[in-house]
Regions:
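N-proximal low-complexity "stem/linker" segments adjacent to membrane-targeting elements
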Residues: 1-23
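Short, acidic, metal-binding catalytic loop of nucleotide-sugar glycosyltransferases
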Residues: 22-31
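A conserved acidic beta->alpha catalytic loop
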Residues: 38-47, 87
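Glycine-rich, basic loop-to-helix element that forms the pyrophosphate-binding segment
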Residues: 46, 62-78
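Short aromatic/hydrophobic "clamp" motif used to bind/position activated sugar donors
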Residues: 83
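Conserved donor NDP-sugar-binding/catalytic core segment of glycosyltransferases
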Residues: 95-126
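Acidic donor-binding loop at a coil-to-helix junction in glycosyltransferase catalytic cores
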Residues: 165-174
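Catalytic core of nucleotide-sugar-dependent glycosyltransferases
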Residues: 189, 193-196, 202-227
Length: 267
């Protein structure tokens, strides 16, 4: 996949990062460019692992500035038309890029594609989110980090907002929407997310609520467009509002879901 760059930010994750890089290099259809950004790691094991990564993997070292800054540094270094961020403790499925790239090549108006997420480690299961819907995206975090995006999306948005410590990927996709880019879900598992004590899933709920308020404040103009986005959503096929949840198909009108999530965040 010579047209794709996979960016792997790493801070003291020597026990995982080699597995992440290997999963990127093992893509069907050819290995992408891989950029690993060492965000000021202090762990000797991490230094040792990064020093033995295969030739061709670009290792960038910087002072510790946080994961968003590390992601942005890697994305800025890329010269390919398509980009994907893979956290150092996660893995790509072997056919991830071969699955995500064709829709982007067929539709020049499409900004990014993403698949389903498989959890492994402390908890296992497939996280099935609803298909892409601009209106629903305002109220629910439905897109994971490891989407394949056009380099132009990164240029237009400026990448990850380094002021966000939670929901930074959600903020990126809202930023893209605000600039006219839409996404598309592919109904296949493309990324494996490691569930462990150091992962952010299950982090303090209060911090998430605060981050959501900041998200809405930053994109207040986009949220004011909610009625027009809702009308656009309602014009779609009913299937867009029916998705397979953890335990089976669930019909959830977007407006109902909005009310539920708004109430949840106010608690």
């Amino acid at each position: 996949m010579p047209d794709v760059t996979v960016v792997v930010p790493c801070f003291n994750y020597g026990r995982y990062v080699e597995e992440a890089v290997t999963s990127a290099l093992a893509q069907h259809g050819g290995a992408p460019h891989v950029v690993v950004v060492d965000d000021g790691s202090t762990d000797p094991t991490t230094h040792e692992v990064l020093n033995r990564l295969p030739d061709g993997v670009d290792v960038v070292r910087q002072e510790n500035r946080g994961v968003c800054a590390a992601r942005n540094a890697g994305l800025a270094r890329a010269t390919t038309p398509y980009l994907l961020v893979l956290d150092a403790d996660d893995r790509l499925r072997p056919d991830a890029l071969a699955t995500l790239l064709p829709p982007l090549e067929r539709d020049p108006g499409l900004g990014f594609t993403y698949g389903l997420m498989q959890f492994f480690g402390d908890w296992e299961g497939v996280l099935r989110m609803p298909p892409y819907d601009a209106y629903r995206l305002l109220y629910r975090h439905t897109i994971g980090l490891s989407a394949l995006m056009r380099a132009q999306v990164f240029e237009d948005t400026g990448g990850f907002d380094e002021a966000f410590l939670q929901f930074e990927d959600w903020e990126l996709w809202l930023n893209a929407l605000e600039r006219g880019w839409r996404g598309r879900q592919v109904d296949a598992v493309t990324v494996e997310y490691r569930k462990h004590g150091g992962s952010k899933v299950g982090a303090d709920r209060r911090r998430y609520k605060d981050a959501y308020r900041r998200l809405r404040a930053k994109h207040a103009g986009l949220y004011r467009r909610a009625p027009s986005l809702a009308a656009e959503s309602a014009e779609g096929r009913l299937g867009r509002l029916v998705y397979r949840g953890f335990w089976g198909p669930r019909p959830v009108p977007a407006r109902v879901e909005q009310l539920v999530y708004e109430r949840l965040w106010r608690r």
